[in-house]
């Protein structure tokens, strides 16, 4: 009888040992809980412009229910150097929770940046460019898609608007200078070339001045330009912080009456300068929408949503068919709205842009749009 009892006990222990643990136990749940997969957005530098884009990323995360899919989107701000982007891309290759990467490329021809983008792609990670692209002529296989502004068109719009401002002041010839962070950046170069093309042959571009994303240097560049070219007729700001830098130095020198100022993007300070009469017009992108569409695209690539990809890129495979553009706005002073004699009208610009992709807004109307989305700049 004793031997029988021992045998039964041993069998009981053996059976217990062979049972599978409860998969719903707290310990098991804790060990297997999934860390959210991340979509990473790498900026080219640190500027409030990217805060607006990040607001769009988070709005996109909510709109497309990333959390329900075990995903999140995170913005990482680069230190305004190519090496910073290279190093971060290399780090992301080694991280298991990266599902997709969007990058605003700081140098369009930087081979190392493109090579690191390709390494991510080879690992199965979706990679796109947003806001700043690579040079597609040199690196046709560097990325599948771009989201952002058609910067050549944007430059032509600014050049056309600037020429109208100059002509309204009786200035039909003279020199202009363009200011940006980097002259070899894809979006900056396309804008400057487009502006030079559209402003016309009567106006000569005498310099392009880069500040390497240094806001203090941006102001110093304007001061230097005014010393070197005292008769300059127009100053053109290409990146968001260039606009307030130009406006501040022109006000400091007391020469607003003889210098026209037209710029890109609507930094909060630039909006105030326009309200005070220190900027003539601004071409404004839609970084908020860039953020929303970035999430939409990365999710579609992650989940193989072919219908979304076709909707976003109906002409994929054709020249320019890999680009999703997010529209442009021309912001004008309130005094020009409904004024038949205003220097600029939408009709003046229609030849430079496709139908339906340009809005002309007064500053007050634009401010209302910003307020609607809780933004201070765009």
Predicted regions and their residues:
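C-terminal motif of bacterial Sec signal peptides marking the signal peptidase cleavage site
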Residues: 14-17
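Hinge/cleft segment of the Venus flytrap/periplasmic-binding protein
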Residues: 19, 25-35, 175, 179-183, ...
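Extracytoplasmic "Venus flytrap"
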Residues: 33-60, 64, 72-89, 104-111, ...
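Short, solvent-exposed amphipathic alpha-helices that sit
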Residues: 49-65, 154-158, 186-203, 221, ...
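Short beta-strand elements in bilobed, periplasmic/extracellular small-molecule ligand-binding domains
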Residues: 63-79, 173-178, 195-215
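Hydrophobic alpha-helical segments within soluble ligand-binding/sensing domains
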Residues: 85, 146-174, 218-219, 266-270, ...
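Hydrophobic alpha-helical
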Residues: 99-122, 195, 207, 211-273, ...
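Flexible loop/hinge segments that line or gate small-molecule binding clefts
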Residues: 116-153, 267-273, 279-280
